[in-house]
Amino acid sequence: MASAADNSTKNGPHSGTIPPLASGDRLTRPEFERRYSAARNVRAELIEGVVYVQASVRHKQHGNPHFLLVTWLGTYIGVTPGVDGGDNSSIRLDADNEPQPDILLRIDSACGGASSIDEDGYLTGPPELVVEIAASTASYDLHDKLNAYRRNGVQEYLVWRVLDDAFDWFVL
């Protein structure tokens, strides 16, 4: 027969509680997705098995540069059949990586593109172009993310280092 102490362990205040995401957590992609789906008003990504919870976005260092690149790439999409894009869309790359790049362009899988859209609406596989606006995130955008994108077949990776007033365009 179970004691009261046994029941409090099974039905206590923390039973069924999903832990929050925190920067630096080391998680599998399924566990990351479980926690991310339970989070409210949190933007995070999983890079090489490490969680990065993203800070609020500043206008001059991120919001406006982001808007300019979305406008440019949106114009390209408008005149290029078979190409679509995403803004802060999660990408299921592999077991340790689910980045949420600022912008992506992809060739539709029916037109020969490498990515597809899962039944639950997530992008799976590498888009053809990934774009990041890097102010505070340049250290991992230019290292761990670059390596993950290269290893998973992203063809091109553009990083706008806003504070340095420089672009890095990698053909991977």
Regions found by a protein language model. Name each.
Residues 1-172:
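Gly/Pro/Ser/Thr-rich low-complexity, intrinsically disordered segments predominantly at protein N-termini
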